[in-house]
């Protein structure tokens, strides 16, 4: 089993792979996918193995970095052509996911800003940007949690609706982040989920 460090999406830079918690296997099994091929990344996004707009976006950014790092292109032109193909293919995997297009475009901007640089520099820039997007998602969700946890200090129960927990993002979730942070701070409460969205 791969260590996701409590995350749903993880960039294993040591082995240059995208690690995803396979949400189609939940709640019966915990399966972590190790992805390094474009077709496997597209399949994971298309078939809802990764769900939640923020998680999908970060998965695509990490996927682009993984594919770029694995490129055997000999010229900058070859590298850029390969990059554009990979970005376009991932973006089409789930056209309605706004964060997917946003993250792919962030990676395009990074590649474009470094288009004259040697391939190794472009790869490093894409890796750095994917790591930034990954870290930013965790930081934003954590901040939501910190602000919201203060509102829950005198609360015994919370009612939640929709998939806004940690499975929808890299780590903390959005609407449920305050519950996770409040728990970290030692506050316990009941959480009622009036809806689930299983894969049917």
Predicted regions and their residues:
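N-terminal active-site beta-alpha-beta segment that forms phosphate/nucleotide-binding
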Residues: 49, 53-200
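Positively charged, low-complexity intrinsically disordered leader regions
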Residues: 1-39, 43-46
